Amino acid sequence: MTFCILFLFWTITHLARRILTRQGAELTKANIVAVLGTGAVGALAYTFTDTFWFSAVEGEVYALSSMFTALVVWLMLKWEEQADQPHSMRWIVLIAYLMGLSIGVHILNLLTIPALVFIYYFRKTQRITFKGIAVSTLISGAILIFINSIIIPHTVYIGALFDLFFVNSLGLPVNSGLVFFVVALLGALGVGVYFTHKKGRTVLNLVLLSTLMILIGYSSYASVTIRAAANPPMNSNNPSNPFALYSLLNRDQYGDKPLLYGPQFSAPTSGYKYKDVRYLDDDGKYKTVSIISGYEHPDEFMHLFPRMWNYAASKESYKSWSAYRTRTDYERDENGEIVRDAQGRPNKIEVLDFGRRTLWDDGSGYEPLVIVEPTFRENLNYFFTYQLNHMYWRYFLWNFVGRQSDIQPTDAIITDGNWLSGIKWIDELYLGPQDNLPDEIANNKGRNTYYFLPFLLGLIGLIYQLNRDPRNFSIVMWLFVMMGIALVVYFNTSPNEPRERDYVYAGSFYAFCIWIGLGVLAVCDLIVWATRRKGLMAPIAATVVCMVVPGILAAQNWDDHDRSHRTMARDIGWNYLQSVLPNAIIINYGDNDTFPLWFNQEVDGVRPDVRIMNTSYLGAEWYIDELKTKANDAPGIPFTLPRSKYTYTNDMLPIENIVDRPLELKEAIDFIRNEDPRTKLVLSNGSKIDYLPSNRFALPVNKDNAIASGIVKESDRDLMVDTIYLELPKRTIDKSEMMLLDMLAHFDWKRPIHFTQVYILQSLGLLNYLQFDGYSYRLVPIYTPNRSVHEIGRIDPDYITPLLTETFRYGNIADPRTYADYFIQYNLSASKARESFARAAKEYVFRGDSIQAIRLLDMGLEKLPPQQIRYTDANTFPFIEGYYMAGAPDKGDSLLMSYARNLMQYIDYYLDFQGIQGDMVTQTIIDKMQSLDRLYYLAAYMGRQDVLAQLNDYYRTLGIYENELIHPDLSTPSDSVQIPE
């Protein structure tokens, strides 16, 4: 990242010199100081922006990608500076090589190409014309398409076709055809470069040489294939042959999304799209299979600019972000008659006025379907409201105006994650009152306010460059738009992204920081005009004044970007691995659950006996193959289905309940494996597919193996059931679920199986056969009905207590210098980190060991203190209840009132909201009141009169509970007052 800032500094100083030396003027000492000031202010401003700083300390590709962006822009400016020299084209050749090299980092760097083309055009042209601009735009688009759509995918694809011939027809080894093609292609380009140079064909020589350099840089991907061929334990997509590499580069796993023309989320399907794919079979030959690659849609449901396209996204979120309207209508019964009240008056209701309704006959012979499609206006509303405003301009203002908090908002709410200036009257216009803030909001380290200063200086610099140097202004604007708004159009984002995406637009913020730097020149000119004095004082004063911008960025962003003392990202993976038994299989989902485990195991060598299985990948044949093999010290997963049953087939497996009894799981898997035509389901088109003949299954329990493997203690033998009965609450299962059933059918209780997320078990009907081990759930043959979503599985305090007190690590969260940001708090919540202490403590209370229970509760609050981890019902209520149950009422009262004061602060604050803003926080007030009520009921049940008195005083100040019967002062616990679940 240091080099990124260095190249940005040089870029800004170059552009500043172009402004100051126009018409051949010489640089004076004052000008040199001004130039250096522009570079320092702009580069330092970008250094301390929220998005860039976050990317700089994140283990991701975007930091290196930013460096490539800054480097190629600076190199093109170096060419522009030396364009008249004999060997100036070497800069363009170097840029071509770096472009090819950067493809291996991220393709976002290609978006600098339009700016580079215009630098070339402006340098080579004295008179700018509309035709020249249009031609330059077309050329830049052609170069983009050539690299992104031809070089990146099709060089590999053509090599794959050669490999197909060499392997299947000539019997040569895999990748021999690819090697032949690469050598032939590079050789042909080399010959072309030689002869065009010899014949003086300068332009063609430059094109061929640049193409050759792009390919040489792009050849860094060879390391991916070489690594994959070595079969390492982690081998994503297994690109060990050119067809697999082509699929990886073509991003097949992400699917397609419409950009300018296509269907919307409600469009019906009229058929499937098919494509041929080739893969290596067990005999070492390529096989070809036709697979479904997407859906066909009727022509009448294809539209321009389909922004609301994702059928898997939340329809309600699409509607809320598209500024839908409501209208008043009459309530009608099932017969269509108007519903009337006792006086005969019609009932009026608010009806969603969204989309247009189209009748569509699907050819089935039934009544036409009513399809509700978003209108073009609603698509535009969604584009401007969500995709542009929420997913770009909000991020832009985060970086140059300020940020409300580090909490990711859900839908269009005003309480979290918005931009914030620090200027009270402006912020109150759209975020509500800014006085009387709750402590958690006021003290959120992600709450950063810059008072519009970076934005205003950048705007001044933008106008200044537009006025003084319109050519270079257009170049910076190309960078700003292509790496910002153009990406918004390209990504066509669906609502409710799993994480904030501001890092994608770092290149656009980089461009704006160029204008921040150039704003120093404008301020310098203003000082000269005001003082009527030229000399060193004006640029020095301008630089000092403008240094306020990077200064305020650094001061405000320092605390929430300081990752020192924090080790939670590593420790959470350690905890997951340490929570499982020896030789276990741990099954998880998604990035946050998996990458920390992989790091601990592959880098730090933690628990090599454990096999990690990510269900997000379990639908891919390469991952199933990988799981079958030994990794580190862990044996493969006991899958038994052959490759023919999961390689480009059985993505969805129907369930037909034709067997009126629970099938033993082995029988069910054998039924899938069977090739007898009688075990196939015949579709309407005559094709035959595998299916399951029942949704009820029996999993026999080998009690001796369960005890020998440590799954169950000998003392709990009598608690084990003989058979676990599963019932799948669905009509189909996907490939990952099919493979999980295969594993369960054949593991024979010889290896412990742990899960990090209970939803995986919910889909398999296993929620009542779990043991919570703190961070993971162990599959056990002991029936344990669930009491609530927060208390799933049984607890063995003898097993979990040493883990909680001696083994687990807590990321140094207890240190007040450690910043527990939104991601840390989310992961702690998902892993039930603090709740583990309370659940274990409750088991000790049941045993009669109150001392140990209190010790665990104290340790939970010590390791993960409320001052660092935000209060929630899930992570606080069990501790209060635990203290009361363990006979420590004073500690329970203290924690209860701390949480109550937190809730009261929020309620007091949100009750100040008025009008539409008040409507937007109504549900939040209700949620906080319900939490406060839970605390009241608990205090009443426990007979805590002092606490009740304080809570009743608060309720009276609100004036919302005038009737004392709602919240009575109970002198003794009453059976009529129950602790709500």
Where are the predicted features?
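Short hydrophobic/aromatic helix or loop-helix immediately within or flanking a transmembrane segment
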Residues: 1-7
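Interfacial loop-to-helix junctions that mark the boundaries of transmembrane helices
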Residues: 27-32
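Short helix- or helix-capping micro-motifs
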Residues: 39-47, 99
